Design a protein with these regions (language model features):
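Extended charged low-complexity segments that act as oligomerization/scaffolding linkers
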Residues: 1, 68-78, 87-100, 157-178, ...
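Walker A/P-loop-proximal flanking segment of P-loop NTPase domains
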Residues: 1-26, 112, 121
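Short loop/turn elements that form and flank the Walker-type P-loop nucleotide-binding site
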Residues: 22-23, 94-96, 126-129
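Post-nucleotide-binding-loop coupling segment downstream of the phosphate-binding loop, primarily
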Residues: 30-98, 110
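Extended hydrophobic
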Residues: 44-46, 141-144, 149-151, 165-168, ...
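Conserved nucleotide-binding/hydrolysis micro-motifs of P-loop NTPases
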Residues: 62-64, 106, 137-142, 180-184
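Short secondary-structure boundary/capping segments
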Residues: 71-75, 115-119, 144-156, 238, ...
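Conserved Walker B catalytic segment
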Residues: 100-135, 146-149
Length: 262
């Protein structure tokens, strides 16, 4: 994340707003590394709060246990030994829920156990008055955690495009797509524009995104990943277009070469 910089993700934001009134309790968001999941959840936290919806932002790698209810009681300084409906949570409704955003649940030391606990928690608090937006980093759908089909009613599915062989999470998850062309152009302007004075890292190459596209299309095509975009503009701050090496140039390779040379 770059402080003060967020590239709008219209489709994903619409999906995360439109499910607010759903009866389902789990919105499973997934994508590859560097796709902008954390930035998106931080933006949705802002949007939910702006709409008057109580929201809590948690990071998977900072849980003190693999029990969501215990974590909520600890973070909110609630009385231990009581159920949530005894602590005022019953006041939330399907239309005006408590929204819990959990970023990077896969980074928890016992991620599968945490995921199962979240499902059990939502099964216990059915009705849509408590909702969880859960992000999980994977490279392919085969790496997603498996949920029993008995949880189908609590897992939100915007579309039912999955094939019959897909399990519940595979067919229900929202896959955060790479940046589209307009978003890439906008992100380039955001990343290379006026920077926060507290941010000491330069991100202004001596060429435009359009010039890069004409120079090396395969290189510019990799910038649909927000993390690769950031690494690229930092590596080429104050520099001209990268020299052609013939063939495909990987931004990850360039980045690793830079680290080795330091």
């Amino acid at each position: 994340m770059i402080e003060g910089v967020y590239q709008e993700r219209q489709d994903a934001e619409v999906a995360l707003r439109s499910w607010i009134g759903a009866r389902a309790g789990l919105f499973f968001l997934t994508a590859e590394a560097g796709s902008g999941k954390t930035n998106l959840l931080a933006e949705m936290m802002r949007q939910y709060t702006e709409r008057g919806i109580d929201a809590i932002f948690l990071r998977g790698n900072r849980f003190n246990s693999n029990d969501l209810q215990e974590e909520l009681i600890s973070r909110l300084n609630l009385q231990k030994g009581l159920e949530l409906d005894q602590l005022g949570f019953i006041e939330y409704t399907q239309e005006n829920p408590l929204m819990i955003l959990i970023d990077g649940a896969n980074e928890h030391s016992a991620s599968v156990m945490l995921f199962e606990n979240i499902l059990q928690f939502l099964e216990k608090h059915k009705g849509g008055h408590i909702k969880v937006v859960l992000s999980w980093r994977v490279n392919t759908k085969s790496e997603l955690p498996i949920a029993d089909e008995k949880y189908q009613s609590i897992v939100y599915a915007e579309k039912t495009e999955g094939v019959s062989e897909d399990n519940l999470i595979q067919r229900s998850c929202y896959w955060l797509k790479p940046l589209n062309k307009k978003e890439v152009e906008s992100a380039w302007e955001l990343y290379t524009g006026n920077q926060n004075k507290k941010d000491k890292i330069g991100r202004k190459p001596n060429f435009t995104y359009e010039q890069l596209t004409y120079h090396d299309r395969s290189l510019s095509d990799q910038l649909d990943n927000p993390l690769l975009m950031r690494l690229f503009v930092e590596m080429f701050h104050g520099k001209g277009l990268p020299k052609s090496r013939g063939g495909f140039i990987s931004i990850w390779t360039l980045y690793h070469q830079k680290l080795i040379s330091q």
